[in-house]
């Protein structure tokens, strides 16, 4: 459809038929599809994701195996479906812990100021002095490979972005009239902070958290690819890409389909972040 034809079509299409935030709608639909895939995997996946069948190894896509099989004869389609459960968990839990820690420390830093603000900001400076992924790898190497180590490392490194965002919002809002009025009424600092101030300072952080899901997803896949995250034979997209690396020229499907799954889920979170930014008037 040409631009002129599209403009005419858009002009005569009733406004109620057109979504106001197409990015928000598209991102929500993509994520809902992945949630359904993750929930239905135990019943819909045609094969056991870790069951090996050497006689069916490296079969191309088609027929019984729509995504082909890997070098152990495991069905790629089933493994992609089961891996969505782990990767969704990584994306969401890997954001929840840094969000809570960073929001609390950023709010206290911006509201109390003084020594508290100085200490929090110096810790943030130290964390930001190291590359994100390098610091993550160092922490996981000390704790040992596994999902728990990944979540701990993510909480120790990822909170700084939320702390900076919330601190900046609190510094702007704490001089507003409604905050000064709450103080003049004798409300405690905790009530002013958590009832009147913090709810109005979370918009940017909520939008950023959706963008951060993309970073956490890619970080989890990268760390699993390096052998420090989810351990084989569990199905995880980063692990599947790593396993298929040696067969990239002879069995392209081993890396292509889990790679596409990572891209689609990341696209869903990114579109949702853009849509929320437009809806709430904040950009990540």
Describe each region flagged by the PLM:
Residues 85-101, 130, 136, 190-222, ...:
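Transmembrane alpha-helices
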Residues 76-111, 265:
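Transmembrane alpha-helix signature in integral membrane proteins
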Residues 66, 70, 100-101, 110-172, ...:
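Generic hydrophobic transmembrane alpha-helix motif, especially the helices
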Residues 140, 147, 157, 203-213, ...:
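C-terminal transmembrane helix and the adjacent membrane-cytosol boundary/short C-terminal tail
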Residues 134-137, 146-151, 155, 164, ...:
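Non-cytoplasmic
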Residues 25, 29, 33-72, 226-234:
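Hydrophobic alpha-helical transmembrane segments of membrane transport/permease proteins
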Residues 1-32, 270-284:
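Transmembrane alpha-helical segments of polytopic membrane transport and secretion proteins
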